Amino acid sequence: MIACTATIDLDSSTATLSSRPQPIAFESLQQLKQLMTESSDFVQGDLADFRRAADNVRLAQLATILCATNLGDKWSPEGTALIGINGDGCALNNRLFWDDFISHGHDNGRASLFVPTLPSIPVCEAAIALHIQGPVRYIATESATLLEEAISDMFATDSTLRQIMTVELFNRSVRCALHTKN
């Protein structure tokens, strides 16, 4: 059962939470982060490395914090798993890395562009930001195919899980949902 959702869309510069009727408008991910960290209305996450992260990591971090915020005082990182699923979340980063590699070669290319090309990095960084104390998994599948099976399997095989958060990244947006056992 989906308990709550959150989305961030860079094209419309809005963030939505299922528990709030009005979207949050922002001009940049840095501004959205500032709005969230300066308000006690949001779950506070560890965003110490936010400025150094690629946009796909920033999107995952902020969306999971927004999703957790939907739960208010009921949010807890204990017994929470996080699953990252396909979208096209790393495609832009893959292209940036490849173009830099082709232009500058192995010795002069920017190695820092490599890390965000790994599809598990955004979801792992989101888990760190929320201090999630459960498993983190990346599944390369369409959101409508193996995801529900993976969620059911995780709940069935791990009795300590209370909830599973899913993060689906696209180049300029992210969808996050929190699934509960019942």
Where are these regions (language model features)?
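Conserved "HGTGT" condensation-loop signature of ketosynthase/thiolase-family condensing enzymes
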Residues: M1-N182
